Amino acid sequence: MQTSPRSAPRIHVSGMDARAAALAKEYHCGYEITAFSYAPNLEREDVFSAVAASLEGLDGLWLHAPFAELIPCAIDPNVRANALFRFRQTLSAAQRLGVHQIVVHGGFIPYVYYPEWYVEQSIAFWQELLSDAPDDLLLALENVMEPGPQTLVEIAKGVADARLGLCLDVGHAN
C-alpha cells in the first residue's frame, strides 16, 4: 500500500545499504530508493526491473534523484538543460514505480555561485520542472553545500508551490 506524501512514515531507511529494504520492512520505516542517484541507471531497464521487484512490501517510498554533475543553477545553459532532462527522467521513473516523493539536490557549489544567483536560478528551474509534474508529487530539496538553511527557505518561498518542500540531511549539515 502506497502512502500519500503527507501520511508517510517519519523515519526512512536509505537504500544505499543492501540490508535497507529488510530493515525498512522489519521496523515499518519508509524506504529511499537510491539506485537512480546514478543518472545512467535511469536509462537501464534491468535496473528499473530490479528496483520494482525489490519494493514488494515496502511503504513510504522516496526516490533519490541523481545529483552528480546536475546543476539546476548552472551558468551554462546546456548544463542546466541536462539537469532538467535528468530530473524529468526521474519524474518518469517515479511515476512508473508509483512513488510520489523525490529527494533532489540543488547543485550549489561554494565559491562558484553567489547565493543570490543560486536562489534566483533555482526558483526558475524548480518552477519549470514542476510546471509539468503531477499534482500528487512532492519534491524535497535537500541541503548539501548551501551556506545555511535560509538559502533553501528562500528558494521554497520563491517557487511558491506546495509540491516543493525541504529535506534536512544531517550528514550534509556537518
Show where each model-derived region lies.
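N-terminal pre-domain/capping segments
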Residues: M1-Q89
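Short linear motifs at secondary-structure transitions and domain/linker junctions
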Residues: P5-R10, A35-A39, P115-E116, L130, ...
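Structural preference for beta-strand elements that scaffold enzyme active sites
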Residues: A8-H12, H28-E32, G60-W62, V99-V103, ...
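Active-site-proximal loop/turn and secondary-structure-junction residues that shape catalytic pockets
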Residues: G15-D17, A35-S37, F67-E69, G106-P110, ...
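Active-site acidic/histidine proton-transfer and metal-coordination neighborhood
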Residues: C73-G165
